[in-house]
Curated annotation (Swiss-Prot):
Job of this protein: Transcriptional repressor of CCA1 and LHY, and positive regulator of LWD1 and LWD2 expression. Represses the expression of other clock proteins and master regulators of plant growth, development and response to abiotic stress. Involved in the positive and negative feedback loops of the circadian clock. Controls photoperiodic flowering response and temperature compensation. Expression of several members of the ARR-like family is controlled by circadian rhythm.
Factors inducing expression: Up-regulated by heat-shock and light at dawn, and down-regulated by the sugars produced by photosynthesis.
Stored Gene3D superfamilies: 3.40.50.2300
Main subcellular location of this protein, as a coarse class: nucleus
Species of origin: Arabidopsis thaliana
Record's compositionally biased regions (Gly residues): 641-657
SMART domains (UniProt xref): REC
Protein name: Two-component response regulator-like APRR7
GO cellular component: mitochondrion; nucleus
C-alpha cells in the first residue's frame, strides 16, 4: 500500500509492512500529530526524549519510535483493533493506546470491524471491543472471530460499563481472554502486549499453551489430599479427588483460554513446563476447554489405590477403605442393619441419589405384620422389665435413643386398623406416648434420662392468656395418635375400656383412703390423686348425677412429692386404653392432652380446657375442671373442646389460672394497662388542644398573598379603641 491510500481515511490507517524504516517515520508523524489533541483532553504526555526538561518516562510508556518490540516479541509493532460505537470513548481510548506505543485501527461497530478482519492483508494482533453495540454486538463479533480459520488465534478483550457477573461470565465462557470495565485505565492498556507474547510462545512451542497447564503434579496431589480431608470430616465417603479436566486440547494455538474453575486438576501425570509469564495473578481471565479424551459429563477420578492408602493412614480401617472404593452406588436399602465397626466411623454413606444408610450396633427394628419387636442389650432396659412390668418404658428409652438415626429414611406408615393389626397399633401408641412425655417428669428411678438437645417449641401465642407460671413449663405434645379407629372395632374397644376400668378400680383400692379417686356411676378417673376427671365410656353417653361427681374436701390436701412420684407409673398404664376411645368433639382424629399437675400430680383430660372452677363437669362433651392452681400444662394442643357449662365456646388452650397469686398478677397488669391508656389519652388531648389553639391564632393573623404580616401601629391602636368601646 502506498502513502496516499493510508492518508485517505484516518479511521483505517494501513501501513506497508515491507519497509520498516518508512513505517517508523509514519508512526512518529502520527504521534506528533495527535499530541496536541491529547493534551487538550487532559492526557499529558511527553515525547521529547532528548530535551532536558522532559519527564523520564518508562520503557512501556514511550512512543512507538523508541519502543523496540523485537527485543521480546517476534513482531515489530502491535496493532490493536478498537471497536467502539461511542465517538468520544473511541477517541479517548485510541489516544491512550497510541500513548502506550500501540498502533490502533478504529471501527465504529461490529460489522465494520469484521470487514477489517476479513481482509487478510490487515495484520491485527489484539481486538479490543465493546460488548453492547448496534448491528453486531461484541459477543457476536467474538463468535465470528473464533469460528474463523485464520483469525481464531487473535486474543479478544471485551470491555463494557456493565460489570455484572452474568455478563462477565458470558463473555469469558464464549472465549474472551479478558474483560475490562469502563472507564478504561491506562495501566490496563499497557499490559495488552502480554496476550501477544502468549500467542507467540504458544505458536513457537517454546512455552506452555497460554497458561492452561499451570497446575503441576504437586498442585494435583495437594488438591486430592485436601478434598479427601474434607470428605472425611463431613462423613461423606465420596471420591474427594473428583475434579474437572483442565487441560486444553487445542493444538492450534488457542491456548490463551485456560481454566478458571475452582478445581483445576490435570489428569495427565506428565509434568509440564510452566512459563514465568503464566502466573496465577495474571490479569487475563481463563476459560475451560475440555479435553476430548474425557467427556465433560463424566467425572474423572484417580486410581482407587491412592485414595485407599490415604484413608488407611487416617483411619487404619480396611472396611472403611472398601466402602470408599465403592462410594457411589445405585442401590439404596431402607433396612437398618447393625455393623461391627463403631458408629462414629460409619455414620452415613452418601449415595448418588441422596439416600443415607444408617447403621448402629445397639438396636435393630423390624416392622411387619406381627407385633413391634424392639430388642436391646442395655442393662437398664432389663432392669425395667424386671421391676414394674411396664414394657413400654423400655420402648420409650429405645425410641428416644434412636429417634434421630431413624429420621432420614425410615417412615412408620399408617397401619390399617383391622382385627389382625390392633395389637400393633396399641404398642405404637405406647411407644409414641412414652417418647413424647415431659423429660423433666421423675419416675421411680427406672427410666433412663436422655441428655440430647431437643428443640422445644413454645405453645404461647398472641391470643392466649398471660400466665407466666404455665408458659414457663409448657411443652408441645404433638399429635399423639395417627391411626383412626373404625366402627367395626367399637365392641372390642368397649370391652378393653371396661377391662381398664376394672384394673383402675383395683388400683384405687390399693391406695390410701384419703387419696383414692372418686369414681361415679358413668365415668371413671384416670388415676388422678387429687382431682375427679370426667371420662365417659362410648356405650353410655349419659350425664352423671351431681352426687356421683361430688368430691370430698379431704382429697385436696397437699401430698409429698415423693408420694406422687411413686404414682407416676400408674398414671401411664392406661394411656393407650384411653386413646382408643373416639374423639369427644368429633373435630379430628388427634387426641389433645392437657396434663395439669398440683405438687407433681398428673391429670389427664381429653379435648378439654382447664379452668379454675371447683366442680367437675361430666358428660361426653365436658372438660375436666380441677382445683389445681397454677399447674403445669405439659401437652395441650389448641383443641375444639367445650366448656363444662355446655356452651360450646371453649378454646382448649388449658391455662390453669385459679391461683390467688396469678389473679393478683393479672389484676396488677390490668391496672398498669389502664393507667397507661389514661396517660396516653390525656397526652393526646393536650396535643389536640394545643394544635387547635395555634390553628385558631393562625387564622386570625392577617396575610398578604399567603404570608403573615405584622399589624401596623395605627391598626393596633384602632383595635384597642374598639376593644375599649366594646367593654
Amino acid at each position: 500500500m502506498n502513502a496516499n491510500e493510508e492518508g485517505e481515511g484516518s479511521r483505517y490507517p494501513i501501513t506497508d509492512r515491507k519497509t520498516g524504516e518508512t513505517k517508523f517515520d509514519r508512526v512518529e508523524s502520527r504521534t506528533e500529530k495527535h499530541s496536541e489533541e491529547e493534551k487538550t483532553n487532559g492526557i499529558t504526555m511527553d515525547v521529547r526524549n532528548g530535551s532536558s526538561g522532559g519527564l523520564q518516562i518508562p520503557l512501556s510508556q514511550q512512543t512507538a519510535a523508541t519502543v523496540c518490540w523485537e527485543r521480546f516479541l517476534h513482531v515489530r509493532t502491535i496493532r490493536v483493533l478498537l471497536v467502539e460505537n461511542d465517538d468520544c470513548t473511541r477517541y479517548i481510548v485510541t489516544a491512550l493506546l497510541r500513548n502506550c506505543s500501540y498502533e490502533v485501527v478504529e471501527a465504529s461497530n461490529g460489522i465494520q470491524a469484521w470487514k477489517v478482519l476479513e481482509d487478510l492483508n490487515n495484520h491485527i494482533d489484539i481486538v479490543l471491543t465493546e460488548v453492547i453495540m448496534p448491528y453486531l454486538s461484541g459477543i457476536g463479533l467474538l463468535c465470528k472471530i473464533l469460528n474463523h480459520k485464520s483469525r481464531r488465534n487473535i486474543p479478544v478483550i471485551m470491555m463494557s460499563s456493565h460489570d455484572s457477573m452474568g455478563l462477565v461470565f458470558k463473555c469469558l465462557s464464549k472465549g474472551a481472554v479478558d474483560f475490562l470495565v469502563k472507564p478504561i485505565r491506562k495501566n490496563e492498556l499497557k499490559i495488552l502486549w502480554q496476550h501477544v507474547w502468549r500467542r507467540c510462545q504458544s505458536s513457537s512451542g517454546s512455552g506452555s499453551e497460554s497458561g492452561t497447564h499451570q497446575t503441576q503434579k504437586s498442585v494435583k496431589s495437594k488438591s486430592i489430599k485436601k478434598s479427601d480431608q474434607d470428605s472425611g470430616s463431613s462423613d461423606e465417603n465420596e471420591n474427594g479427588s473428583i475434579g474437572l479436566n483442565a487441560s486444553d486440547g487445542s493444538s492450534d494455538g488457542s491456548g490463551a483460554q485456560s481454566s478458571w474453575t475452582k478445581k483445576a486438576v490435570d489428569v495427565d501425570d506428565s509434568p509440564r513446563a510452566v512459563s514465568l509469564w503464566d502466573r496465577v495473578d495474571s490479569t487475563c481471565a481463563q476459560v475451560v476447554h475440555s479435553n476430548p479424551e474425557f467427556p465433560s459429563n463424566q467425572l474423572v477420578a484417580p486410581p482407587a489405590e491412592k485414595e485407599t492408602q490415604e484413608h488407611d493412614d487416617k483411619f487404619e480401617d480396611v472396611t472403611m477403605g472398601r466402602d470408599l472404593e465403592i462410594s457411589i452406588r445405585r442401590n439404596c436399602d431402607l433396612a437398618l442393619e447393625p455393623k461391627d465397626e463403631p458408629l462414629s466411623k460409619t455414620t452415613g454413606i452418601m449415595r448418588q441419589d441422596n439416600s443415607f444408610e444408617k447403621s448402629s450396633s445397639k438396636w435393630k427394628m423390624k416392622v411387619g405384620k406381627g407385633p413391634l419387636d424392639l430388642s436391646s442389650e442395655s442393662p437398664s432396659s432389663k432392669q425395667m422389665h424386671e421391676d414394674g412390668g411396664s414394657s413400654f418404658k423400655a420402648m420409650s428409652s429405645h425410641l428416644q435413643d434412636n429417634r434421630e438415626p431413624e429420621a432420614p429414611n425410615t417412615h412408620l406408615k399408617t397401619l390399617d386398623t383391622n382385627e389382625a393389626s390392633v395389637k400393633i397399633s396399641e404398642e405404637l401408641m405406647h411407644v409414641e406416648h412414652s417418647s413424647k412425655r415431659h423429660r423433666g417428669t421423675k419416675d421411680d428411678g427406672t427410666l433412663v434420662r436422655d441428655d440430647r438437645n431437643v428443640l422445644r417449641r413454645s405453645e404461647g401465642s398472641a391470643f392466649s392468656r398471660y400466665n407466666p407460671a404455665s408458659n414457663a413449663n409448657k411443652i408441645s405434645g404433638g399429635n399423639l395418635g395417627s391411626t383412626s379407629l373404625q366402627d367395626n372395632n367399637s365392641q372390642d374397644l368397649i370391652k378393653k375400656t371396661e377391662a381398664a376400668y376394672d384394673c383402675h378400680s383395683n388400683m384405687n383400692e390399693s391406695l390410701p383412703h384419703n387419696h383414692r379417686s372418686h369414681v361415679g356411676s358413668n365415668n371413671f378417673d384416670m388415676s388422678s390423686t387429687t382431682e375427679n376427671n370426667a371420662f365417659t365410656k362410648p356405650g353410655a353417653p349419659k350425664v352423671s348425677s351431681a352426687g356421683s361427681s361430688s368430691v370430698k374436701h379431704s382429697s385436696f390436701q397437699p401430698l409429698p412429692c415423693d408420694h406422687h412420684n411413686n404414682h407416676a407409673s400408674y398414671n401411664l398404664v392406661h394411656v393407650a386404653e384411653r386413646k382408643k376411645l373416639p374423639p369427644q368433639c368429633g373435630s379430628s382424629n388427634v387426641y389433645n392432652e392437657t396434663i395439669e399437675g398440683n405438687n407433681n400430680t398428673v391429670n389427664y383430660s381429653v379435648n378439654g380446657s382447664v379452668s379454675g372452677s371447683g366442680h367437675g363437669s361430666n358428660g361426653p362433651y365436658g372438660s375436666s375442671n380441677g382445683m389445681n392452681a397454677g399447674g403445669m400444662n405439659m401437652g395441650s394442643d389448641n383443641g375444639a373442646g367445650k366448656n363444662g357449662n355446655g356452651d360450646g365456646s371453649g378454646s382448649g388452650s388449658g391455662s390453669g389460672s385459679g391461683n390467688l397469686a396469678d389473679e393478683n398478677k393479672i389484676s396488677q397488669r390490668e391496672a398498669a394497662l389502664t393507667k397507661f391508656r389514661q396517660k396516653r389519652k390525656e397526652r393526646c388531648f393536650r396535643k389536640k388542644v394545643r394544635y387547635q389553639s395555634r390553628k385558631k391564632l393562625a387564622e386570625q393573623r392577617p396575610r398578604v398573598r399567603g404570608q403573615f404580616v405584622r399589624k401596623t401601629a395605627a391598626a393596633t391602636d384602632d383595635n384597642d379603641i374598639k376593644n375599649i368601646e366594646d367593654s
